[in-house]
Every structure is written in structure tokens, then in C-alpha cells.
């Protein structure tokens, strides 16, 4: 027999017990059952946050998966009062994202083919404090045809993300066939300080601090022979900004992998770092780090790098980091590890 309860609040715990009623005699003919506890399903996207006003002293509170999805919606739709640089968020509980088959990143980037620093709209620009909590069962599985693709829990970060732990799987594949950029990271896909801030940078802009990731990350250029793929446990590509006190754990069942056209860069912390700093970060595990190519056509210059902390650096500093990796490091002939 199936019973339906109506009028219940979403994502709320209830207790229920039952007792049989004989209708013909209109009397109860059994003892009460034991109390059973259950929790109602969450909405896909919440109507409001759990509290707060968005200031540093009174941040917007996130206690449910649907409220994290609301943050993604507010940033990606540029909702006034929720996406600006001075808006603060605080995670107040561990979250399980298993109800989202394909998570929409917080900050998708411009989605118009340009780098986010050329058009920083739809980047996360505020301050997100994870409160030491964990986001479990993250699943990002992007497939599309955009020239620039950046995915992670956060797609593009131009703000501050701190005190956050994430476990799950992040992947991106493009069907674009010319000069594509495909970037994937466990916490952040693409980390930047927008060019408009370069002369007067906001404090904390492009910062990832005290974060950790456990799981798999992959970025593939599909059939594009001219594409660039970057993947990292914390961040796929950092054009600038700082990554401090972060950690990636790559268990035996997990992989961080790129499949590029011309360029393929894979790192335990970041795939590539083109400015800024990585400091006091740790990479451990027994899984697989791989920088591969979709094709090796004649006439193309190809470039592959993989490393425990970062695959490739340019005008960036690496300070006080450690890598204790007992897994497999795979690169094509001629690549660098």
C-alpha cells in the first residue's frame, strides 16, 4: 500500500508512524508502528538563501544544495545584489550534490568565445567562505561547441573562494573544431584578476585559499587539432591570482587528464599558471596524471606538460609546495613532466 503525504516543506526532516483502521467497523485494530524518519527532497533551485544580507558581517547563508544552485543562477544571470565584488556568502553545512546529474558551474564566463578577462561578466566576483564544509558528489559533465569552456564547481573565479572541500568528478569536452580552449578544475575552472582591475586590484580578487579536492578531472578538445586543454585538481588554468594552502588527493581510482589539440597541460593543483602564485599547496595520491593529444597531425607544433603541482608556469611563482605522488604520470613522446 502506498501513502502520500502532502503539504510538506522541501529539504525538511519529518517523523511518521502508522496504524491500521478497519473502515467497516470504524475502529483501530493494530498497534502503532515504530517511528520512521525521512527527509523530503530539495528543490532544484531555491527561492531564497538561508539568511543574511550579503555583507561581510552578515553574509548570505547557504545550507542546502538548492541554495548553492541559486548562487550559480544569480551569478550566471547577473542578478543585481548577488553577483557584485562586495557580496559575501557562507556555507553552513556539508552538501550532497548527487541530485544534480550535471552541475551548472557558478560563473560560466561570457559564453561568447572570448576569454573572461576580455569580458569578465558571468564570473564569480564575490567572497565565498566554505566554512570548512564539504561539497560531496559534484558531477560536471559539459559537452558543447563554445570556443571557450571553463568548468568546475566554479567555472570562472574573479573573487575569493576559501575554506572549501569538494569531492566529485568534473569533465568538459568541446565539439568546436578551431582554436578551442577547454579548461576544467575541481574547485575552479579558470582563475583570473580581470584586466579592468589590474591597476587597482580588489583585495582577494582571483584568490583560492584553504581548499581541497578529491576526485577526477578531465578536459578534452574533442577533434580540434588546434585546441588547448588544461586540467587541475584545484584550478584548470590560472591567468593570474593566487592559490594558497590548497590540497588535491588523487586516489587510485581517480584521474586528472587532458586531451589537447596543440596544447595539453595537467597538474595536481593547477593545469597551467600564467601569473600569480601557488604557495603551501600539497598534491598526494596513487591515481593517474595524464597530458595527451587527440591527434598528432603533421605541420602542427604540439606541447604537453604534466606535473604534481602545476603542468606549466609562465611569470608565476611556486612556493613551499609538496608533491607525494605514487601513481602514473603519462605524457606523449616529447612532452615534459
Please tell me what each predicted stretch does.
Residues 23-42:
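Extracellular fibronectin type III
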Residues 17, 36-39, 107:
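Short, isolated positions within intrinsically disordered regulatory regions of eukaryotic proteins
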Residues 42-337:
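Surface-exposed repetitive/solenoidal architectures
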Residues 4, 37, 61:
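Conserved beta-strand positions that form and line the central face of beta-propeller blades
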Residues 5-25:
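Beta-strand-rich modules
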Amino acid at each position: 500500500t502506498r501513502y502520500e503525504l502532502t503539504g510538506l516543506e522541501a529539504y525538511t526532516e519529518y517523523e511518521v508512524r502508522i496504524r491500521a483502521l478497519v473502515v467497516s467497523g470504524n475502529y483501530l485494530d493494530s498497534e502503532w508502528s515504530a517511528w520512521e524518519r525521512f527527509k523530503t527532497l530539495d528543490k532544484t533551485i531555491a527561492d531564497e538563501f538561508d539568511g543574511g544580507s550579503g555583507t561581510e558581517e552578515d553574509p548570505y547563508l547557504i545550507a542546502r544544495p538548492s541554495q548553492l544552485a541559486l548562487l550559480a543562477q544569480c551569478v550566471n544571470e547577473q542578478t543585481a545584489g548577488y553577483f557584485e565584488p562586495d557580496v559575501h556568502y557562507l556555507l553552513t553545512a556539508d552538501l550532497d550534490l548527487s541530485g544534480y546529474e550535471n552541475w551548472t558551474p557558478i560563473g560560466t564566463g561570457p559564453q561568447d568565445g572570448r576569454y573572461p578577462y576580455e569580458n569578465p561578466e558571468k564570473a564569480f566576483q564575490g567572497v565565498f567562505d566554505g566554512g570548512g564544509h564539504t561539497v560531496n558528489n559534484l558531477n560536471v559533465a559539459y559537452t558543447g561547441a563554445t570556443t571557450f569552456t571553463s568548468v568546475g564547481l566554479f567555472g570562472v573565479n574573479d573573487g575569493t573562494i576559501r575554506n572549501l572541500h569538494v569531492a566529485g568528478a568534473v569533465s568538459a569536452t568541446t565539439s568546436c573544431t578551431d582554436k578551442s580552449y577547454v579548461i576544467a578544475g575541481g574547485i575552479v575552472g579558470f582563475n583570473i584578476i580581470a584586466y579592468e582591475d589590474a591597476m587597482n586590484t580588489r583585495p582577494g580578487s582571483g584568490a583560492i585559499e584553504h581548499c581541497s579536492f578529491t576526485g577526477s578531472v578531465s578536459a578534452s578538445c574533442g577533434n580540434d587539432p588546434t585546441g588547448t586543454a588544461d586540467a587541475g585538481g584545484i584550478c584548470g588554468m590560472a591567468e593570474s591570482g593566487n592559490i594558497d594552502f590548497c590540497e588535491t588527493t588523487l586516489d587510485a581510482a581517480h584521474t586528472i587528464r587532458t586531451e589537447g589539440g596543440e596544447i595539453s597541460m595537467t597538474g595536481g593543483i593547477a593545469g597551467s599558471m600564467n601569473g600569480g602564485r601557488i604557495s603551501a599547496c600539497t598534491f598526494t595520491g596513487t591515481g593517474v596524471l595524464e597530458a595527451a593529444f587527440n591527434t598528432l597531425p603533421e605541420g602542427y607544433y604540439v606541447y604537453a606538460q604534466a606535473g604534481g603541482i602545476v603542468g606549466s608556469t609562465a611569470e608565476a611563482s611556486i612556493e613551499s609546495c609538496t608533491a607525494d605522488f605514487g601513481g602514473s604520470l603519462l605524457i606523449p613522446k616529447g612532452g615534459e613532466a
